[in-house]
Regions:
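Short, charge-rich amphipathic alpha-helical segments embedded
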Residues: 84-104, 185-190
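Short, charged amphipathic alpha-helical segments flanked by flexible coils
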Residues: 92-142
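N-terminal cysteine/histidine-rich coordination modules
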Residues: 1-66
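Charge-enriched, short contiguous segments at helix-coil
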Residues: 136-257
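Short, solvent-exposed segments of well-ordered alpha helices
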Residues: 51, 67-75, 142-146
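Short, hydrophobic, well-ordered secondary-structure elements
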Residues: 61-95
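Mixed-charge (acidic/basic) macromolecular-recognition segments
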Residues: 77-86, 112, 116, 123-135, ...
């Protein structure tokens, strides 16, 4: 899967009349990586770092949709399942945001995120523990037990038993994950989860630190230019969680293009 990342230097070379939000922008195609930071060199030689503000679970879900379109149904189910796991991780960070950043959106000390990352890698990297942490924090936030999408049976058959799902099974699985994420996003938006939900870039910063620690890479000091690519899931847009387009409709529209 390739991402089209805009070159901001090229963008500012465009005439004023071509800088609208819907205008074509010069982009650099990059293979999907394991962090949200991409160092790019465009065709004009501009070098810059792009900070992709799409969340990892959104990108992984899009990867599943692309696999569906190309009729790779095992890969689609795997991507959807992993996207849901990363959504739980996103939610955990979201619930803990006030522990990481103050009301002025300033990080609470330089060691706050690295310490949490070490705790995460040592304790919460197993999916069962992540779900347990998510449920506990959700109950604390909303006072009710979260309704989870039961994806374990098909997921385990596909990943551990080499099962090849049908197109319908993969579509139904993807739609189930989509509806689950959408309902949680709507819930978060309605309450604004104690204020930090709108601060998507700060959730993303915490996620980047976790990714870097997982990969044993140096923590970034330069996040670069913020950019976003259009994807099926956009957890910070009410047009997504109040919309009605299905995974099947989206895949069909991609096939027409």
């Amino acid at each position: 899967m390739k991402l089209a990342i805009p070159c901001t230097s090229c963008f500012f070379l465009l005439p004023d009349g071509q800088r609208g939000l819907n205008s074509p922008q010069p982009t650099s195609l990059r293979e999907l990586g394991n962090t949200s930071l991409y160092d790019i060199t465009c065709d004009r030689g501009h070098q810059q770092r792009g900070w992709l503000t799409n969340h990892k679970f959104e990108i992984l879900f899009e990867s599943g949709i692309n696999a569906l379109k190309d009729e790779y149904y095992r890969e689609a189910v795997t991507s959807f399942a992993v996207a849901l796991e990363r959504f739980y991780e996103f939610s955990i960070i979201l619930f803990l945001m006030d522990n990481f950043f103050d009301e002025r959106q300033v990080q609470r000390g330089p060691d706050t995120l690295p310490k949490f990352g070490k705790f995460w890698n040592g304790t919460l990297k197993q999916s069962e523990r992540q779900i347990g942490a998510f449920c506990s924090l959700y109950i604390n936030e909303f006072g009710q037990i979260p309704l989870l999408f039961d994806e374990s049976e098909l997921r385990n058959k596909v990943i551990h038993a080499g099962y090849i799902p049908s197109c319908k099974q993969a579509l139904d699985f993807g739609e189930g994950v989509n509806k689950s994420i959408k309902e949680f996003c709507k819930k978060y938006d309605e309450k604004d989860v104690g204020r930090p939900y709108k601060r998507a870039s700060y959730v993303q910063r915490a996620s980047i630190v976790l990714d870097m620690l997982k990969l044993k890479l140096p923590l970034p000091t330069n996040y670069g230019h913020m950019t976003k690519v259009p994807l099926f899931i956009d957890a910070t847009s009410d047009s997504y969680f109040n919309g009605s387009i299905s995974v099947a409709d989206y895949v069909a529209s991609m096939s027409i293009l």
